């Protein structure tokens, strides 16, 4: 697949002196060329000025690495699927153009506001302005989560207590919030929860005592662990 020249504006044009050297030099060198400037008083003395070649960005440096492109594409494909070379290059050029497009728009905003650093808000603003509104909300959630993780990591390095983090599953999506202590004890102190409370109405009883005979609850008996009566959760099915 032959590519065009989407990044041709990155190539620096040759200067007038370099064009004259290319036209009048009989033995041009590919790397450097020299210009001999004669001295005003002595014709034998001259100053050799080395001319550097024009800085032209290589094509492979203008695109996202193909290995990264293939890795991202394979995440959404089954293991037995194959990707042709032209498909890889098409996605590579598309992703590279997209990055350049959004970054250029964000850079213009920074220049108007006389700022040197492009922030995440600049990228989101540029994407919204260019019509990529569907990406703004998910990326906003991602950026907020990323900043919270970085804040917790910095607190851990400084020895500060991290915030309460409850992670759901293995995908890294979690809830971050302030740490909370135990709730205040009830009128009977810290005790065990009666089964009648689980069924929709009951009370807290200190030391797990419900005020009833154990044999009358579900018709079963419960054992004692460390001096505390343990409730038989399956007594109602006996």
Curated annotation (Swiss-Prot):
PROSITE patterns, per the entry: NFYB_HAP3
Subcellular locations according to the entry: Nucleus
DNA-binding region in chain numbering: 64-70
Keyword Transcription regulation: yes
Keywords: Abscisic acid signaling pathway, Activator, DNA-binding, Nucleus, Transcription, Transcription regulation
Keyword DNA damage attached: no
Reported impact of residue 85 to K: Affects function
InterPro entries membership: CBFA_NFYB_domain, Histone-fold, Transc_fact_NFYB/HAP3, Transcrpt_fac_NFYB/HAP3_CS
Tissue: Expressed in green siliques. Present in etiolated seedlings.
A cellular-component GO term for this protein: CCAAT-binding factor complex
Biased composition (Low complexity): 208-227
Database matches in Pfam families: CBFD_NFYB_HMF
GO molecular function: chromatin binding; DNA-binding transcription activator activity, RNA polymerase II-specific; DNA-binding transcription factor activity; protein heterodimerization activity; sequence-specific DNA binding
Subunit association domain (SAD): region residues: 91-102
Chain intervals for the UniProt region annotation (Disordered): 203-238
Primary residence: nucleus
GO BP term (any one): blue light signaling pathway
Entry-linked Gene3D superfamilies: Histone, subunit A
Knockout-associated phenotype: Altered response to blue light (BL) and abscisic acid (ABA).
Family: Belongs to the NFYB/HAP3 subunit family.
Complex and partners: Heterotrimeric transcription factor composed of three components, NF-YA, NF-YB and NF-YC. NF-YB and NF-YC must interact and dimerize for NF-YA association and DNA binding. Interacts with PRN1.
Protein name: Nuclear transcription factor Y subunit B-9
Lineage: Eukaryota, Viridiplantae, Streptophyta, Embryophyta, Tracheophyta
């Amino acid at each position: 697949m032959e590519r065009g020249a989407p990044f041709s504006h990155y190539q620096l044009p040759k200067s007038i002196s370099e064009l004259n050297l290319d036209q009048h030099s009989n033995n041009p060198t590919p790397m450097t060329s020299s210009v001999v400037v004669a001295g005003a008083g002595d014709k034998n003395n001259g100053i050799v000025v080395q001319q550097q070649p024009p800085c032209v960005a290589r094509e492979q440096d203008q695109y996202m690495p193909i290995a990264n492109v293939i890795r991202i594409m394979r995440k959404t494909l089954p293991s037995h699927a194959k990707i042709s070379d032209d498909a890889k290059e098409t996605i590579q050029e598309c992703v590279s153009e997209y990055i350049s497009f959004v970054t250029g728009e964000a850079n213009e905003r920074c220049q108007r506001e006389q700022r040197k650093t492009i922030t995440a808000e600049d990228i989101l603003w540029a994407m919204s302005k260019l019509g990529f509104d569907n990406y703004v909300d998910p990326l906003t959630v991602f950026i907020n989560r990323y900043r919270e993780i970085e804040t917790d990591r910095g607190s851990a390095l400084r020895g500060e207590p991290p915030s309460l983090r409850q992670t759901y599953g293995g995908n890294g999506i979690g809830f971050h919030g302030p740490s909370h202590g135990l709730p205040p004890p009830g009128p009977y102190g810290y005790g065990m929860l009666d089964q009648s409370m689980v069924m929709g109405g009951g009370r807290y009883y200190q030391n797990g005592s419900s005020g009833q005979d154990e044999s009358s609850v579900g018709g079963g008996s419960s054992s004692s662990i460390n001096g505390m009566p343990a409730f038989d959760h399956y007594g109602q099915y006996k």
